[in-house]
From Swiss-Prot:
It comes from Alcelaphine herpesvirus 1 (strain C500). The keyword Iron does not apply. Keywords: Capsid protein, Host nucleus, T=16 icosahedral capsid protein, Virion. Transmembrane segments: none annotated. Belongs to the herpesviridae major capsid protein family. It comes from the Viruses. The gene is MCP. This is Major capsid protein. GO terms for cellular component: host cell nucleus; T=16 icosahedral viral capsid.
């Protein structure tokens, strides 16, 4: 091969000018292209070998000069190591002396300790490719003879120059990128480093309590120190704040390295540079603008130091902070001066001169002064921008925010602000206002959440039951109940004997959980000691209970709560229901026909011990027959007027039939005008409530059914009035209802209804009636006797409103059902001389003048009523077609199609109708003896089973109540299982609890009416439209993504960079070109004695999501789950905007459950940040949402637990017998989400989300997926332990070879801290728009709670500047 003479200009070892680096580049390129002229040969491909050699030589000369010009090099010891290719990844030993303290108290001095610190080397390979065309290489060999040849030659030179420059620039950028990556790999986040470096923690060791402290400090530092540039912009003195932050950043890292005293970069005045801050262009400009430049250049080496290792054993050692140039020097050091005393400076002078002898040059960089330390500030973002590569200091970070919707704030005893004037001081909000990233106020209300709330998965208990059944039922067998879950048929038709036998044989009292909850406060229910009750509170729409199915076997059952009023009081208190009533009034423009004074008259009547007993007899004789009412108008008028004149109360107010007919037939002056006006008002109020409900529901049809029954239970045809005097059962014949009469069950009313004989034909039927009364065995006569009904739905609705709303509210539930023995009543009335001796006694004479002592006289005297003989005779005539006795019918119907999801047992709802029964109030003791032969109490409905009223009528019930203190309350009173089963009823204990404590006011009427609104999708839709609270609050969860610009600080001499020699290889890619691949090996060693680099997010470049109110659409996720009625599905889909004809005809969606998500045609504020809602009790503490907490309602970060003990970790998460570690006085703030098997758990936990479309994003999943939570907690646990091992105590004393690197998972912690902390940050939100306006005012303090509304400030790492209009939040 021909010898080539190459021109080479090595770097001089002498003083040079400041522009040396530029000269190196120019001289190298010039020499290279002159050498091209020496390439001769016949085959260009052969000559390319020489070009390869040539390229390698000159690449070696000019490579990595740009790196020395960067500020990043100031934090490194840069050394050329020609033998680097022979080195493999390994460990290098450094000997470090640990200083000690000489004590003055006589303690024995410590010996000098030296430790060998093991540092791991890391090798890196960078390469660049240079591709040259064959034609260009041929042109390089030609002798330019003409001008055209010269022009072509010059073009070739330019092409080769460009290719060479491209490759060399790539290598130079590669070195910078490699060093920056190495720095980042050794740079933990500031909030971790500061927390773990706290000496108060490291001195105490890493106990469980310390780890919990660390989590708290992580959160504090994360919120306080993140994005300090943004926070400084809102301050009056941003310079001081930024200097303080930079000082914290600089002081958080270790200044100690194995190269003690080494400083290769100084200012022009000789001050050593403390380190370098690497950041982005935007932050660099902001820092220089605020802080100013201290210096504009630094003095640094213009070349790499030479590093040579000789000898058989390749050992690199640093002793006493001085670098050993060779193994011989290291050996001499150990032999000649092992303790490093005399002459140590002379012996180390050689290593010092290694850096001092390098040529120096000035490098233009920006230097700021933080305290007394000069720090280089630079940005190399331009290099990445030019290469169109992502800048490592730009990161996408995700933060999860949460805010509450619909919380109820009890009326406070005081207020902290008076700036907002509201019409009512006890408002209830059904919306929440948030501010998106463009400072646009947005309203999130229940309409936004309908796509979740209306989904069948939310309205079904199946998933919750499945999880409960997986639990240990043996532990719950002792808590199981047999009574209260389902009714049992009566033995016969003798209602009196059935009730009497139940209370005589009752030896134990059953206090059902549904009743126990009613008598607890919110704090009591959520207390750990009540975890047995709390474990059954899993769902806002369902009651769960343990049923005993065998001697030692139990099973969990779920029944729908049906009405919003059936949510227990601790989770929906009475004051909250009153506020809902006001919303109902406002939405329906309800104008009450009565005033509170009128309702007080009803209440006074119910509690009046002198209520005329004769009124019960009159009511029994009429028993709901209009013709008998008209026959007995004189007697009725006498009772009304007498009682009104004596007490000012209203007679017959316990019967809607009587009230309605009084208003119809007695308006002509037959009774007192004032009394009649009150009757009319009462009836008018019932009509007004009916019209208000209709206005709320609207006039829409749901197929062939009216919509009202799906919204409010009072208009549901499945619910019958509690008292029947006519055939009201026929309307259910075609609705799948079943009727239990005695021990038999029928599916058609015609099978058990006997029509009452027509009163007009009494003469013809009287003998037959007399015969049946005296010959039938009425105990086994399983039929009821009522008059034919007219199926007037409107009249039935008014009757239900009166008995289910008006009477319970006005009487505070001081009522009971009452059965009658009609024959005994007729005997008491008729078997008296003035009554049946017509010739002797004039019909106009009052009976008390001629009446002998007996029950009737006692009754009339006690009632202060003195009727005429004709009045009593007409009353006796009414007995001709009276029924024989009072009966009950147990009505079982299927729930509406929105509430019948889940097990079949829960799809059945029951209630009892008393046939020819009445409502009774309490009676005085003196009347009990007389009354017991005619009437008897029947506790058949939760509103009509007051134990005190029942006990006043029956001694056996009275003894039962007196012997069992828990049975004195309406909601807990046990009733015979044949006529009432609490969990299967329409009206349950919470509604009974409300009526016992509410005021007799129009507000209570409205509240109790809206409490009959159903917990169903259609009801949610209607209430959301009218802004009526549905009965439960929501926790709204949203994850936002920000593009963060980070700041990295690296201390001086914290990394040793070794630059090897390049190798050039040829690789032919195609026939017309030759590629040369330049490979270069690098090595780095982290030299700090602790973490010497740190990174922290400093500035929000942009928020990529809209921070808006777009809510998750569960119908797209679980598209195969539907209701079992096409009209219901179509209505729900149409009203909430999920009607998609494609999905309905798509087999993939129906079979696999894969929905098709509809995407908007365009966006305005950025990518939608999907919100998900978690049902939450309205009594949840608003303070819980004012700081970072778990959206589950219970702390979920188990970093302080043992990761190897999964049982303990799960106990931390789900065991509510233990208090919430974050709030010791309660187990949870949201039992519907924090418990295993709760609605939130099954809705967002991946165990239950059998989704075939994995692309659906769920911000709630990380907080509910148990496996992911435990995995993140294990990672967090490992991360804390690993960092703590490196930072606890003096690191050099460790006998391990721990390296100061970023622990796996740190990037996730930095970019998604909410995953590890298991907490979400509160975002700016207010339950009323005006509170946002107040926040934007000049005030510095703002009331968090104001007149029933609440305001939550944003507490998050991202500090947003809120501006609405011209107002900026202070």
């Amino acid at each position: 091969m021909e010898v080539c003479r190459l021109e080479n200009r090595p770097l001089p070892h002498a003083a040079v000018e400041a522009n040396l680096l530029r000269q190196v580049k120019e001289s190298a390129a010039e020499g290279l292209f002159k050498s091209f002229q020496l390439l001769v040969g016949k085959d260009v491909r052969e000559n390319s070998v020489r070009f390869e050699v040539l390229l390698g030589v000159y690449a070696n000369v000019i490579e990595f000069v740009k790196f020395l010009e960067t500020g990043l090099a100031a934090s490194c010891i840069n050394t050329e190591f020609r033998d680097l290719k022979r080195m493999v990844d390994g460990k290098i030993q450094f000997k470090v002396s640990v200083p000690t303290i000489a004590h003055s108290d006589g303690r024995r001095p410590n010996k000098q300790r030296q430790y060998i610190v093991m540092k791991c080397t890391s090798k890196h390979h960078i390469s660049a490719e240079i591709e040259l065309a064959i034609a260009d290489l041929e042109n390089m060999h030609m002798e330019p003879e003409t001008d055209l040849d010269m022009l072509e030659y010059i073009g070739t030179v330019k092409t080769v120059t460009s290719a060479l420059q491209f490759g060399i620039d790539a290598l130079e950028r590669g070195l910078i990128d490699t060093v920056l990556s190495v720095k980042l790999r050794h740079a933990p986040p500031l909030f971790i480093l500061q927390s773990l470096s706290d000496p108060t923690l490291t001195e105490r060791g890493l106990k469980k309590s310390i780890k919990s402290d660390l989590v708290s400090m992580f959160k504090d530092h994360l919120i306080t120190h993140s994005f300090f540039i943004n926070k400084a912009e809102a301050l009056a003195t941003p310079r001081q704040y930024i200097l303080g932050m930079l000082s914290s950043i600089i002081n958080s890292v270790s200044k100690e390295t194995v190269f003690k005293g080494t400083s290769t970069y100084t200012t022009s005045s000789g001050e050593p540079v403390a380190g370098v801050i690497e950041t982005t262009d935007a932050i660099l400009n902001k820092l220089l603008t605020l802080l100013g430049e201290y210096k504009t250049e630094v003095v640094g080496p213009a070349a790499y130091a030479s590093y040579v290792v000789r000898g058989e054993n390749l050992v690199t050692a640093v002793s006493y902070g001085r670098a050993m140039r060779s193994f011989e020097q290291f050996k001499n050091k150990l032999v000649d001066d092992p303790v490093g005393q005399a002459g140590s400076l002379d012996k180390n002078a050689d290593s010092d001169n290694e850096y001092s002898s390098l040529p120096q040059t000035t490098i233009p960089v920006s230097v700021v002064k933080v305290g007394s330390q000069p720090v280089i500030v630079e940005s190399i973002q331009k290099m990445y921008n030019e290469a169109q590569a992502p800048f490592p200091l730009n990161r996408r970070m995700q933060y999860t925010y949460f805010f509450p919707l619909g919380l109820f704030i009890p009326r406070p005893k005081y207020t902290t602000s008076t700036s907002v004037k509201l019409e009512d001081d006890s408002c209830l909000s059904s919306e929440v206002w948030v501010v998106n990233k463009t400072n646009t106020p947005l309203c999130f209300n229940y309409q936004n959440a309908l796509r979740t709330l209306c989904h069948p998965r939310v309205n079904s208990p199946s998933a919750c039951l499945q999880e409960l059944q997986r639990s240990n039922l043996a532990d719950n067998a002792l808590e199981a109940f047999r009574d209260g879950l389902r009714s049992r048929p009566m033995d016969n038709m003798n209602l009196f004997a059935h009730v009497r036998r139940f209370y005589l044989k009752r030896t134990e009292v059953v206090l059902l959980p549904i009743a126990q909850k009613c008598n607890l406060s919110t704090d009591d229910l959520l207390h750990p000691t009540n975890h047995k009750l709390l474990q059954l509170e899993l769902h806002p729409l369902f009651d769960f209970v343990v049923e005993r199915v065998a001697a030692e076997e139990a099973a969990f059952r779920a029944t729908h709560r049906t009405f919003s009023g059936n949510i227990p009081q601790p989770l929906a208190p009475n004051q909250f229901q009153d506020s809902r009533g006001k919303q109902f009034e406002a939405a329906t423009s309800l104008q009450h026909a009565v005033d509170d004074a009128t309702l007080e008259v009803i209440r006074s009547t119910a509690f009046d011990p002198t209520y005329p007993f004769i009124c019960y007899i009159v009511e029994a004789m009429i028993h709901g027959q209009p013709e008998k009412f008209t026959m007995n108008i004189p007697f009725i008028s006498l009772c009304i007027n007498t009682y009104w004149d004596n007490s000012g109360n209203l007679a017959f107010i316990n019967s809607f039939f009587m009230v309605k007919n009084i208003c119809t037939h007695m308006g002509g002056g037959l009774i007192n005008r004032d009394a009649y006006a009150l009757y009319r008002k009462i009836l008018g109020e019932v009509v007004a409530i009916k019209h208000a409900i209709v206005r709320m529901c609207g006039a829409e049809q749901l197929g062939n059914n009216e919509l009202q029954g799906y919204v409010n239970g009072l208009l549901d045809r499945q619910l019958l009035p509690p008292f029947a005097y006519r055939d009201t059962f026929a309307q259910l014949d075609n609705r799948g209802a079943r009727f239990v009469i005695g021990a038999k069950e029928h599916d058609n009313s015609q099978a058990f209804v006997h029509a009452l004989p027509d009163f007009e034909n009494a003469n013809q039927v009287a003998p037959a009636m007399y015969h049946t009364r005296n010959t039938f065995n009425w105990d086994t006569f399983e039929y009821i006797t009522v008059s034919n009904g007219n199926n007037d739905a409107d009249a039935a609705d008014l009757e239900k409103i009166y008995y289910y709303v008006m009477l319970p509210v006005c009487t505070n539930g001081h009522m009971c059902g009452m059965g009658a023995d009609f024959e005994n009543i007729a005997i008491v009335l008729g078997y008296n001389i003035p009554v049946f001796d017509i010739p002797q006694f004039n019909g106009d004479d009052t009976v008390l003048e001629h009446l002998e002592n007996g029950p009737l006289r006692d009754i009339l005297i006690a009632s202060e009523v003195n009727p005429t003989a004709d009045m009593l005779r007409m009353m006796i005539v009414s007995y001709l077609n009276c029924p024989q006795m009072t009966q009950v019918v147990r009505v079982k119907t299927r729930r509406d199609h929105c509430q019948n999801l889940g097990p079949e047992q829960g799809a059945i709802i029951e209630h009892t109708v008393m046939v020819n029964g009445f409502v009774c109030f309490g009676i005085p003791e003196r009347m009990k003896q007389v009354a017991k032969n005619m009437f008897y109490p029947v506790p058949f409905h939760r509103f009509y089973c007051d134990p005190l009223v029942a006990g006043s009528w029956d001694n056996h019930i009275q003894n039962y109540v007196m012997n069992n203190f828990s049975q004195r309350s309406l909601e807990a009173f046990n009733a015979p299982p044949g006529i009432m089963a609490d969990y299967a009823e329409w009206h349950k204990a919470p509604m009974a609890k409300y009526i016992t404590s509410c005021k007799a006011s129009t507000a209570s009427l409205s509240a109790f009416t809206v409490m009959h609104n159903k917990l169903s999708p259609i009801a949610f839709i209607v209430q959301a439209k009218h802004k009526i609270h549905p009965g439960f609050a929501l926790t709204v969860l949203r994850t936002d993504e920000v593009l963060a610009e980070n700041v990295m600080f690296s201390a001086r001499a914290s990394t040793s960079v070794f630059v090897g020699r390049p190798t050039v290889s040829r690789r032919e890619v195609r026939a017309d070109a030759v590629s040369f691949e330049v490979n270069h090996e690098l090595a780095t060693i982290e030299t700090g004695l602790s973490y010497s680099s740190v990174v922290t997010p400093a500035h929000v470049a942009s928020i990529t999501t809209d921070m808006g109110i777009y809510c998750q659409n569960l119908f797209s996720i679980f598209s195969n789950e539907i209701y079992d009625h096409a009209d219901v599905n179509n209505y729900v889909a149409r009203k909430i905007g999920v009607e998609d004809a494609v999905n309905r005809h798509n087999p993939r969606a129906l079979i696999a459950g894969v929905g098709q998500i509809s995407h908007p045609p365009g966006l305005v504020h950025g990518q939608y940040a999907t919100c998900e809602v978690i049902p939450t009790p309205v009594t949840a503490d608003v303070a819980y949402f004012q700081k970072s907490n778990s959206p589950r309602g219970r702390a979920s970060c188990v970093v302080s637990s043992d990761i190897n003990n999964q049982e303990r970790a799960e106990q931390f998460l789900y065991d509510h017998s233990l208090p919430d570690p974050a709030y010791e006085y309660r187990s949870t703030v949201n039992p519907w989400a924090s418990q295993k098997g709760s609605l939130g758990d099954v809705l967002y936990g991946s165990r239950y989300r059998q989704v075939s479309s994995p692309g659906i994003y769920s911000p709630s999943k990380p907080f509910f997926n148990k496996e992911e939570m435990l995995k993140n907690n294990r990672s967090f646990y490992t991360l804390v332990n690993e960092y703590a091992q490196r930072l606890a105590g003096y690191a050099a004393t460790s006998c391990t070879d721990l390296q100061y690197v970023v622990i796996n998972g740190t990037d996730v912690f930095l970019e998604q801290p909410c995953l590890f902390l298991q907490e979400a940050f509160p975002t700016l939100s207010a339950s009323h728009r005006v509170l946002l306006d107040e926040y934007m005012s000049f005030k510095n303090t703002h009331a968090p709670v104001h007149m029933g509304h609440y305001f939550i400030e944003e507490v998050a790492p991202v500090k947003r500047v809120f501006k609405i209009g011209n107002k900026v939040a202070s």
